[in-house]
Amino acid sequence: MKKESVGVVETKHYNLSEELILDGGDSLKDVTIAYETYGTLNKQKSNAILVCHALSGNAHVAGWHEGDRKPGWWDNIIGPGKCLDTDRYFIICSNVLGGCQGSTGPSSLNPETGKQYALEFPIITIKDMVKAQKKLIDHLQIKQLFSVVGGSMGGMQVLQWCVSYPDMVRSAIPIATTSYSSPQQIAFNEVGRRAIISDPHWNEGNYYEGEFPDSGLALARMIGHITYLSNESMYEKFGRRLQDKEEYSFDFSTDFEVESYLHYQGDTFTKRFDANSYLYISKAIDYFDLTENGTVSLSEALKNVKARVLVISVDSDWLYTPAESKEIVMAMTANEVDVSYCQIKSSYGHDAFLLEAGQLSYIINGFFSETLVVDVMTIHAATITEDSSIEEAAELMLDEKVTHLPVVSEDYRMLGIVTAWDISKAVALKYDKLDQIMTRDVVTALPQDPIELAARKMRKHNISSLPVVNDQGNVLGLITTDHISTLIAGDKY
């Protein structure tokens, strides 16, 4: 399959209609969420993948904006025929709350003052970012995400989604991340913040009408960027080579290529990022701790996770180490979560999750190819009780636009199924009760059945729908031939 770009794209904006209550007790009014989408949401709204970005990222994850010289930050894995295939999936990425690329943050106008929030913006957490994303997903009328994917701080958001909204996440892929920020990670973030705060132009955060604290922000970026690389990658990229000179300068000017590279990274960063946003987002990273500062175990924190999870680490990542990823896997395994683990082999360090598109695509494609019934089924499917009338069943089918209704007991135990064909037969024969027409010997699927098994059952019995039940026979949802054809054929409609 030919791999292509999604082409020219535009950033959209969603304005929350209600206040957003924050983790720390404050609230925000008139919150705006900037987001981009790629691909088409199918009619079941079951093919949506939410991509979560890292500290310095934004909603522009793929394609090109008019006049851009570079594509979106994960364009190498998102697009037609790529790993996150936009011919098959509907990809969503939003700028995080507290950001500076279209979503409400400290550089946004405070509706109560008409001026930038600056330090009047409340402290936020990863949980707040995810809460804002959930508002967006609700706005898009998506009841359950096919997957949530993200690296670094994006991986923290993935884990928070699994914890905060377990019923909304079918699969999750946290990459190069951690379940809580370590003292070393907090230390690096604090040095970066001090670099910004120490800049005389920072002015207690009130710099928007004057000169910006670019020197401090550039230094913060330089410090952070070092943690994204590995010693091996720096040797490969720079060694001890001098920058545009044959010998040492014997002064404090730039001598080495690696110095010049860091200066470039810092300077370019100031042209696209807000210093106050850096303060707020890095603090949110520091506060991230699923164990709630050690008051619960990680296993306890992850006990309600329902998603199928793929944890990915990078062998040369010393910012968020493989050991931290394995700790997540162990905690999920203790809760019998369907979790798998893969490690990217790379010399790039933490940034490998952005650069190793080949390995990442191979791993993720393998994970998605093992699609289960739970990954695509309709949850909260319409059901009806045995004592209902034929007329009630017909009205429910029309209202819900379905052709199959599982018949259940008061505790949602599967009793049978009635179809549109059964209703037609009932009208012809003048039946008035469901128990006169419903099928009691029903072919069903389990949520953990491979999708191929469900498809074989439908072909064998010449049926177009299977109720999905748990081990106790309770109805959990419904899977149809439309779900399967959309998944296999990449049918967007």
UniProtKB/Swiss-Prot annotation:
GO term, biological process aspect, one: homoserine metabolic process
Binding sites annotated in the UniProt record for substrate: 221, 351
Enzyme class: transferase
Keyword Protein biosynthesis: no
Subcellular location: Cytoplasm
GO-annotated molecular function: homoserine O-acetyltransferase activity
Signal peptide: none
Any one Pfam family match given in the protein's UniProt record, by short name: Abhydrolase_1
Keywords, alphabetical: Acyltransferase, Amino-acid biosynthesis, CBS domain, Cytoplasm, Methionine biosynthesis, Repeat, Transferase
Coiled coil, from the record: none
Substrates-to-products reaction catalysed: L-homoserine + acetyl-CoA = O-acetyl-L-homoserine + CoA
One GO term describing the cellular component: cytoplasm
AB hydrolase-1 domain sequence ranges: 47-356
InterPro entries: AB_hydrolase_1, AB_hydrolase_fold, CBS_dom, CBS_dom_sf, HAT_MetX-like
Enzyme Commission number: 2.3.1.31
Catalytic site positions: 152 (nucleophile), 317, 350
Pathway this chain belongs to: Amino-acid biosynthesis; L-methionine biosynthesis via de novo pathway; O-acetyl-L-homoserine from L-homoserine: step 1/1
Role of this protein: Transfers an acetyl group from acetyl-CoA to L-homoserine, forming acetyl-L-homoserine.
Quaternary assembly: Homodimer.
Family label: Belongs to the AB hydrolase superfamily. MetX family.
HAMAP family: MetX_acyltransf
Name of the molecule in the record: Homoserine O-acetyltransferase
Source organism of this protein record: Methanobacterium formicicum (strain DSM 3637 / PP1)
Encoding gene per record: metXA
